[in-house]
Amino acid sequence: MPATDESTGETLPPGAILNKRYVILKVLGEGSFGVVYQARDKRLVRSRKQVAIKQMPMQSIVDCERQSDLRATLNHPAIPRIFDYFALEDYSYLVEELVLGQDLEAILKAQSDFLSEETVVGWAIQICDALDYLHNHPYHPMIFRDLKPSNVMVDDDGVVHLIDFGLARAYPPGFFQEAQPEFEHLWKGLAMGTEGYSPPEQYQGYVRPQSDIYALGATMHHLLTKRDPRNELPFSFKRCPVRSLNPDVSKGLEAIVMKAVDLDVEGRFANAREMQTALEGLHL
C-alpha cells in the first residue's frame, strides 16, 4: 500500500506517514489502550532514527500531554524518553524512545520452568533503582501506580524499562517526607491500578512510595512462583509464601518479597533504596 500523509486509520499500514514526519514500519502491540507502532523519523535521514509511537483515542490527548509534561524532565536508563506528542483527527499520538525486547509477562509465559532467582533479583534491583529515582525526583516526585510484568520491558541487553506511565502521578517536592496540610487534598485520588498487583491503600485512592514497593513485590512473587495474582483472591500473598510454591527460592529472597507485599504500608520497606540494598545483600 502506498504511503499516505496524515493517516489516521484505526491501524496504520507499513509506509503510512504521520504528522509529515514519522514513517510507520510495523505494529508492535495492540490493546485496550490503543496501538503501538515502530516508526522511522524522516527528519533524521542520516541516523535513520527509529521510535515507538502510541496511538490512542482522541479523549486521551489530555493524558498524552500529561505524560509528556511529566516525563520531559526524567533522565534514567529504565525510563524511555519522550520526543513528541500530537493529535490528528480521531487520535492522539505519543512518540517515545524505542525499546526492543520482551515484557516480563511474555518472558514468564514462554518459560516451562521457574525463572532463576538470580534473573528475577537482577530485574528487581534495576526496578528498585528506577522507582527510587521517580520517588525522589527533585521537581515532581512520582508514583508509578501500575507496576506489573506487562509494564516492564527487558531489552536485548538485559536492561529493564518501565514502559507505561499512563497511571503515574506526580506530587510536589518534599510531599512524602512530612505531613503538609496544604497538600492534604492531593492524597486522595481515583482508585486506579491493576487488580492483584495494586496494594489495599490504592483501592481507597491513596498512594505512597510504598505502594509501588507492594506492586514490585507482587510482580516478583508472580515471576518466582508463576502464581498469577489476578486469578487469586485479592491480597492473599501471605497464604502462599514464595517457597511453598517454589522451594528452590532462598529464604532470604522469600523474606524480601513477603515484606514488600505486607498489607500494612509501615510493614513494607521504607523506600525503594532500602529494598534494593536488601536484594543486593543476598550475595547470589
Predicted feature residues:
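AlphaC helix of the eukaryotic protein kinase fold
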Residues: 57-73
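Protein kinase catalytic-loop region centered on the HRD/HxD motif
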Residues: 129-142
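Conserved short submotifs of the Hanks-type protein kinase catalytic core
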Residues: 89-103, 107
